[in-house]
Amino acid sequence: MAGGDGTDMHGRPFSVETIEAVWKKARPISGIDPDDWRRDPCGVPIQRSKYGDISSKYGWQIDHIKPPAKGGTDDLSNLQPLQWGLNRHKGDDYPWQCPLAGEQDKPEIRLLFLSVKPPAWGKTGQRRIKR
């Protein structure tokens, strides 16, 4: 499917420049290096190095806000970073909103919101070790 699972509207991988520009659209997480970690538009933490990694809960994809199937384009204004599970949940829905609190009871959404939390970082940028 063209424009699906993090590809452009022609089914090709996005360029490195586009990936970086879309990454910068994600919201920084206070106290954490924004080059490594940010939040997608739904508030779910994503990790820069996990772009396209659907085996990681921090994996993310480039989503077409308005899907190509509904007339959307590859223009940067129509692209957003989205945690991969949410991107699959969204599919070609348009308009689409992040799942609300009541929808978090759906198994696929609940798994995302309950299991995806930002890593614990100390002020020095080092991972905190739980004892």
Q: Which ranges hold each PLM region?
A:
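Short, charged surface segments at domain edges that flank catalytic/cofactor-binding sites
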Residues: A2-Y51
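Polybasic, low-complexity binding patches
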Residues: K70-S77, R88-R131
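Intrinsically disordered, low-complexity segments enriched in small/polar residues
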Residues: M1-G4, M9, P41, K50, ...
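Flexible domain-boundary/linker segments
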Residues: R39, L82, W96-L100
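Histidine-centered nuclease catalytic patch
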Residues: V44-L82, D92-Y94
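Short, cysteine/histidine-rich loop/knuckle motifs that typically chelate Zn2+
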Residues: G85
